């Protein structure tokens, strides 16, 4: 949610500039937006992509076209390497969405993404970092946060796309 993102930015000591989701689908509009940031002194865009795909290639192309350097710290890292980074940097992420509760048990909603969850996903042969959208998580704390996000859990919601538990800040 916007409130979560704003609170994450606050705890990082950074500003956040929300961009409507549809902007990414409009190449011209997105590149124009990136150029505006370039003109304000931005040099880099950090992307969280792990695997090469259409979206990651678009991100790279758009950044380079706008004169910005894409930084992809997770690019082509193994799932185990990513788990090790989560542990090393004390990242606390809460599982907030499960695409198919027949595949990943709903009991994991609201739990931390940790080695126990990682090993369970490996055991049931689901991508351990959810790269195909099997689950989503929300970061609520990390070693670079000023303090942990203060949140409560909302009511579990069942949709055609999966099951989710909102975090309320």
Residues covered by each model-derived region:
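Short, surface-exposed, polar/charged, turn-prone segments marking secondary-structure boundaries
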Residues: 11-13, 72-75, 98-101, 121-125, ...
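A generic structural signal for short, non-catalytic loop/turn and secondary-structure boundary residues
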Residues: 88, 133, 158-160
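C-terminal accessory domains and tails appended to enzymatic cores
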Residues: 151-169
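A conserved mid-domain beta-alpha-beta active-site/ligand-binding segment of alpha/beta enzyme cores
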Residues: 96-154
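Generic structural hydrophobic/aromatic packing signal, biased to beta-strands
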Residues: 70, 93, 138-140, 165
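ATP-dependent adenylation/nucleotidyltransferase module used to activate substrates
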Residues: 1-95
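Extended interaction regions within the primary functional domain
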Residues: 32-33, 37, 142-143, 168
């Amino acid at each position: 949610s916007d409130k979560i993102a704003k609170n994450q930015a606050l705890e990082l000591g950074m500003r956040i500039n929300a961009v409507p989701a549809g902007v990414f689908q409009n190449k011209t509009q997105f590149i124009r937006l990136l150029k505006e940031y370039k003109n304000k002194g931005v040099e880099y865009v950090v992307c969280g992509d792990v695997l090469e795909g259409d979206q990651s290639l678009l991100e790279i192309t758009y950044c380079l076209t706008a004169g910005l350097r894409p930084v992809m710290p997770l690019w082509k890292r193994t799932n185990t390497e990513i788990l090790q980074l989560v542990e090393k940097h004390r990242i606390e992420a809460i599982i907030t969405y499960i695409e198919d509760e027949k595949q990943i048990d709903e009991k994991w909603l609201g739990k931390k993404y940790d080695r126990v969850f990682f090993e369970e996903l490996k055991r049931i042969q689901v991508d351990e970092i959810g790269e195909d959208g099997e689950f989503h998580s929300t970061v609520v704390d990390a070693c670079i946060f000023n303090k942990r996000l203060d949140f409560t859990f909302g009511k579990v919601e069942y949709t055609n796309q999966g099951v989710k538990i909102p975090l309320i800040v």
